[in-house]
Amino acid sequence: MKHAPLVDQLINAFTCLPGVGPRSAQRMAYALLDRGRESGRRLGDALHAAMDGVQHCERCRNYAQSTLCPVCEDPRRDASLVCIVATPGDVLAFEQSGEYRGQYFVLMGELSPLDGIGPRELGLDVLEQRLNEGQISELILATGTTVEGEATAHYVLGLAQDAGVGVSRIAQGVPMGGELEFVDGATLAQALKGRRPFDA
């Protein structure tokens, strides 16, 4: 079916989002044009505001509206404890848990030489500077368990060791509420390796 050029432009714009193919993009465009004109205007305004007003925190690389993000600005956060994560979504997951009171360093990806993502693209030079300032006493590695995530964790481990900073890795294994019969062997093996004493 042939669309008006502006409709095609809207559909193509939606396909830049992860997981949105041409059919989903078409449905979204039709929904906005058919019955969501005011919602579409609000979406456009929010997109413009975010594209113009959101930047990366100078300290941790998370999203921010000024030079520092709310976590780095908060004097109640423990600046000696820094959790290394791949994405701002990972920060949100930790924050929603309500258990972590340290700061973060957001890599915005993981090492992947085949994709042209090296240490500089992940801001690891910035992390190295922070480590050498002497204010960080422990890094918590919370990268993924993929090949890229493990390579990134090992690279960061080397930086931390060179700076004399302690390193820990988040536990991995069986999810809360998970049934063992549905857990894959590699995950179960990791859970066994990461076991700890059990007390009441």
From Swiss-Prot:
Zinc finger map (C4-type): 57-72
InterPro entries: DNA_Rcmb_RecR, Rcmb_RecR, Rcmb_RecR_Znf, TOPRIM_dom, TOPRIM_RecR
Keyword annotations from UniProtKB, A to Z: DNA damage, DNA recombination, DNA repair, Metal-binding, Zinc, Zinc-finger
SMART domains for the chain: TOPRIM (SM00493)
Superkingdom of the organism of origin: Bacteria
Record-annotated disulphide pairs: none
A Gene Ontology BP annotation from the UniProt entry: DNA recombination
Start and end residues of each Toprim domain: 80-175
PROSITE patterns: RECR, TOPRIM
GO MF annotations, alphabetized: DNA binding; zinc ion binding
Keyword Hydrolase among record annotations: no
NCBIfam families for the chain: recR (TIGR00615)
Function: May play a role in DNA repair. It seems to be involved in an RecBC-independent recombinational process of DNA repair. It may act with RecF and RecO.
Protein family (similarity comment): Belongs to the RecR family.
Protein name: Recombination protein RecR
Gene of this entry: recR
